[in-house]
Amino acid sequence: MKVSVLGSSGQIGAYLTEHLTMKGHLVREFDIANNTYEDMTHIPNAFLRNVIMDSDFVFFLAFDVGGSRYLKKYQHTYDFINNNTRIMANTFDLLKTYDKKFVFASSQMSNLSFSPYGLLKNLGELYTKSLGGLITKFWNVYGIEKDYEKSHVITDFIRKGFETGVIDMITDGQEEREFLYAQDCCEALETVMNNYNDFKSDDELHVTSFNSVKIIDIAHIIQQKFDMIGKKVDVKPSIDTDTVQQNSKNVASKYLTNWWKPTTSLDDGIAKVFTSMKKNYD
C-alpha cells in the first residue's frame, strides 16, 4: 500500500515511517525538515498535492508543535496560529479533492478551550469529521527527537542530565500525564489503518498507556538511569505550577483497546530512549 506520512521527520512520524516501511508499505515522506518545498504552509503546494493524490492512505501528523516548554513560549503567537491553520487548510482541501482515507493526529488537549493548541486541534477534528476521516488523540507520546527546541519532557530531562547534570524543571512536577512509547503509538496507528472501515469519525480513538504518572516521578526515573551509569544528576523542580494544561485532567477512552493495547512499560520505554541518547554523549 502507498502510505503518505505528513510530518515524517517529527517524533511520531519518524518512528511511523520506519515501522510502516518494515511492514512492506511504500511510504512517502513529507516534512519541511527534508526540503523547503515540503513546507505545508505554502498554498498551493504542488508537491503536497502530488503526494496526496498518489497515496492509498494518508497519516496527517504534521503540526507546528512541541513539548510544554515550546507551547508555553509560542502557542499564543501569530506565527504558531497562522502556521497551523495554513497547514490544515492546505491539507484538508487536498484530502477532500482526492477523496483519500486518512487519519488526523489530534490531542487529548483538543477540548481545552483556553489553549490555542487545543483549539487548533479541535478545528482539525471538525475538518476531519466533515470529510469522514478518522481522529486519533495522542497522550504524550515519547521517543527519540531531533529538534531539541521542540523536545518533550522525557527527552528534555535526559538531555539536561547529560549536558548540565541538573534536571531543571519548568514546573513543580505535581501535574500528571499519561505517557506512551512511540513504537506502541505506531502499532496503534497501523491498527487503525488496517481496520479503517470498523471505525467512524466520531469514535474516541485515544492512543495512550492509560497509566497516569506525575512529572516529578518521571524526573526521578530518569535520575535512576543516570545512577546506573555512575553519573550524578540532581532533580530541581520549579515553584511554578502547570500553565499549559492548567492541571486539567481528561479521562481516556479505552474504545481502541478492542483492537490494540500498548505493550511497553514506562520504565522500559524511558530506558530505550536513554540508551539511544547516551550514544550522543559517549
Predicted segments — roles?
Residues 114-118, 122-191, 221-223:
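NAD(P)-dependent short-chain dehydrogenase/reductase
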Residues 88, 154-155, 215, 219:
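A general structural signal for well-ordered alpha-helical segments in protein cores
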Residues 1-144, 272, 276-277:
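N-terminal Rossmann-like NAD(P)+-binding domain of SDR-like oxidoreductases, especially those catalyzing
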Residues 83, 112, 143-146, 157, ...:
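Structured catalytic cores of enzymes that bind and process phosphorylated ligands/cofactors
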Residues 7, 161-282:
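C-terminal substrate-binding subdomain of Rossmann-fold SDR/epimerase-dehydratase oxidoreductases
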Residues 49, 92, 129, 155-159, ...:
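Solvent-exposed, non-membrane alpha-helical residues enriched in polar/charged side chains
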